[in-house]
């Protein structure tokens, strides 16, 4: 068993960097490991057009550590009113790489999201024409649907129809959490892929609920039962190029998580590749990590692979109990616990 693991530099195909003072912390954590990241647009107000995406991109670039080459890949937030012209303008910008479907009310800052899938068909047609991928938060939001069933229900009610109606549209089913989603992606045409988070590979709902409620495991889509966790691990280590890394690292200030009505999101960017390495090692599949983390994503998006490399070493270290987050602090995933892999910093 090797104690060193060298990979082409990975990318994160789903991250939340937030905005304002928090960028000074979140951008550095992401840039430490990743060459590029697909940056979620669910700000307040959301990133709805190329001009807003450019302004946000400039704020991210200004927060990069010195000498960093980290590249934010910007995303539009689809609304019921997103036009085909806005899609074409965004594609022509060269820095907007996708558009995101948030069903209204599905997750953090999704109130401006899409109320009916049919309302964005004009935008989806334009996206298919210009080659812009659709990123999907795949959950229905009707009150009568159990929170643990919302992903499967979304597949049956909406996603199959979108994939069939727009056969040339690239679709990324983001942060999949169920065996149903993994099976759907495997059986779908080649233009359908999926991201998987480290926390959905490492944890299930028992970790969040047994022995007391642990708010720092609370995320959306919510952690599912262990059989779904195993199905996600199967998909991640399979070598299937449809599955690739997307952390969904989503920081919230401590007081917003440790509350009577806490926010959804796990902060993993500070040690993302180390956490994925632990998950892959559980399956004796470290040889499949580079494909999942560094190759499948850029290949799906039609972007060049990174050419530089990172090295992980088998070395135990203690995750910090908290990290700075703008004017507050954030409790990261695995806070205070021991991690088994460590990223070698440049020059180490």
Swiss-Prot record:
Which species does the entry assign this protein to? Answer: Pseudomonas aeruginosa (strain LESB58)
Pathway connected to this protein: Pyrimidine metabolism; UMP biosynthesis via de novo pathway; (S)-dihydroorotate from bicarbonate: step 3/3
List the active site: 248
Q: What is its EC number?
A: 3.5.2.3
Assembly, per entry: Homodimer.
Q: Which InterPro entries match?
A: Amidohydro-rel, DHOdimr, Dihydroorotase_CS, Metal_Hydrolase
MF terms per GO, please? dihydroorotase activity; zinc ion binding
What this chain does, per the record?
Catalyzes the reversible cyclization of carbamoyl aspartate to dihydroorotate.
**Record-listed N6-carboxylysine modification sites:** 100
Protein family according to the UniProt entry:
Belongs to the metallo-dependent hydrolases superfamily. DHOase family. Class II DHOase subfamily.
Q: Which UniProt keywords apply?
A: Hydrolase, Metal-binding, Pyrimidine biosynthesis, Zinc
Q: Which HAMAP family match?
A: PyrC_classII (MF_00219)
A single GO BP term for this record reads: 'de novo' UMP biosynthetic process
Q: What is this protein called?
A: Dihydroorotase
Positions bound to substrate = 16-18, 42, 137, 220, 252, 264
Q: How is the cofactor bound?
A: Binds 2 Zn(2+) ions per subunit.
């Amino acid at each position: 068993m090797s104690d060193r693991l060298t990979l082409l530099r990975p990318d994160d195909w789903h991250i939340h960097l937030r905005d304002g003072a928090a960028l000074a912390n979140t951008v550095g954590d992401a840039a430490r490991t990743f060459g590029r990241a697909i940056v979620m647009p669910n700000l307040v107000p959301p990133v709805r057009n190329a001009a807003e995406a450019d302004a946000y991109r400039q704020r991210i670039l200004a927060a990069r550590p010195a000498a960093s080459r980290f590249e934010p890949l910007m995303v539009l937030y689809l609304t019921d009113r997103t036009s085909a012209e806005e899609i074409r303008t965004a594609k022509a910008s060269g820095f907007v790489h996708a558009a995101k479907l948030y069903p209204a009310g599905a997750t953090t800052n999704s109130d401006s999201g899409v109320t009916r899938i049919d309302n964005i068909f004009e935008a989806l047609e334009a996206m298919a024409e210009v080659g812009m991928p659709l990123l999907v938060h795949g959950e229905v939001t009707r009150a009568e649907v159990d929170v643990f069933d919302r992903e499967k229900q979304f597949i049956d009610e909406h996603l199959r129809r979108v994939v069939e109606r727009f056969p040339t549209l690239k679709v990324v089913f983001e942060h999949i959490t169920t065996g149903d989603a993994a099976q759907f992606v495997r059986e779908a045409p080649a233009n359908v892929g999926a991201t998987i988070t480290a926390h959905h590979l490492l944890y299930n709902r028992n970790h969040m609920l047994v022995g007391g409620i642990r708010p720092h495991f609370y995320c959306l889509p919510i952690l599912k039962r262990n059989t779904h966790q195993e199905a996600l691990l199967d998909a991640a280590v399979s070598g299937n190029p449809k599955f690739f890394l997307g952390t969904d690292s989503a920081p919230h200030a401590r007081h917003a998580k440790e509350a009577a009505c806490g926010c959804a999101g796990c902060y993993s960017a500070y040690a993302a590749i180390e956490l994925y390495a632990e998950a892959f090692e559980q399956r004796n599949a470290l040889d499949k990590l580079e494909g999942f983390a560094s190759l499948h994503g850029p290949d799906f998006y039609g972007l060049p692979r990174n050419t530089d490399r990172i090295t992980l070493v088998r070395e135990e270290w203690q995750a910090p109990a908290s990290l700075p987050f703008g004017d507050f602090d954030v409790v990261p995933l695995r806070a205070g616990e021991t991690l088994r892999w460590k990223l070698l910093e440049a020059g180490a």
